[in-house]
Design a protein with these regions (language model features):
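Active-site neighborhood of HAD-like aspartate-dependent phosphohydrolases
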Residues: 1-33
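Conserved SAM-binding loop
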Residues: 5, 80, 98-101, 133, ...
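Short beta->alpha linker loops
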Residues: 11, 35-39, 79-83, 104, ...
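Phosphate- and divalent-cation-binding pockets in alpha/beta enzyme and binding domains
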Residues: 15, 43, 83, 108-111, ...
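Anion (oxyanion) recognition and catalysis
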Residues: 21, 92, 169
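A metal-dependent, Asp-based hydrolase signature
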Residues: 37-71, 90
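Short, acidic loop-to-helix structural element flanking the phosphoryl-transfer center
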Residues: 70-100, 106, 110
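Asp-based, Mg2+/Mn2+-dependent phosphohydrolase catalytic module
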Residues: 89, 105-205
Length: 205
């Protein structure tokens, strides 16, 4: 969802760095970029191990989500990525089944879907936060394919992150790597197709 449907990454980054400040964590830009595509819990678990923290990952998660909630509700610049809404409508109109498979929490997913009125276009939503393994584990995409009712060879994944692309590749599902102006230091080498504009994958194409 983040980086493909909405550009909430700047909001998440603000929330994470506020959380880092709360707990006095010195997180480099390169370390932060390596988190892209992972669930909040997985990231916080990694932070606890790296910095040898005596607190639980859930304490970090709660701090980050508190900051994100405030930023989400007050940042007027938050909007959908150019062309994303048109692509969703195009696929829906042509009877393609859409399943959202995101590392974001279901709370965040529902907030985004409510804000942009997206529920009617999707047959299901999956949060990686509710699964045993986070991306780059393929579990989330295998579950999405199963929910769609189609063989995975007839499905596609649209991803903007290294971890998501690895997960799709490991699942054996055709992966479209979306390389946008907001994509930083992500590896698209395992993507089956790399695009920079959603017009490149509209239904007629």
């Amino acid at each position: 969802m983040d980086g493909v449907i909405v550009n909430s990454e700047p909001l998440h980054k603000k929330a994470y760095y506020n959380m880092f400040k709360d707990f006095k964590l010195d997180v480099s830009e390169s370390l932060y970029e390596s988190f892209t595509g992972k669930s909040t819990y997985s990231i916080c678990e990694q932070l606890c191990l790296k910095f040898n923290l005596s607190i639980t990952p859930y304490e970090l998660v709660n701090s980050k989500r508190k900051h994100f909630k405030y930023i989400f509700e007050n940042d007027k610049s938050f909007k959908m990525i150019d062309g994303a809404f048109e692509l969703i409508k195009d696929y829906y109109k042509n009877n393609l089944k859409l399943v959202l498979a995101s590392s974001a929490s279901m709370l965040t997913i529902n907030k985004v879907f409510e804000k942009f009125d997206l529920d009617k276009f999707f047959v299901a939503k999956i949060s990686g936060a509710d699964l045993k393994q986070s991306k780059p584990n393929p579990e989330i995409f295998l579950k999405a394919a199963k929910i769609s009712g189609h063989n995975k060879k007839d499905c596609i994944v649209i991803e903007d992150s290294t971890n998501g692309i690895i997960a799709a590749n490991s699942a054996g599902i055709f992966c479209v790597g979306y390389k946008s102006k907001n994509s930083f230091n992500q590896n698209y080498s395992l993507a089956d197709l790399v695009i920079s504009n959603f017009n490149q994958i509209c239904f007629k194409e």
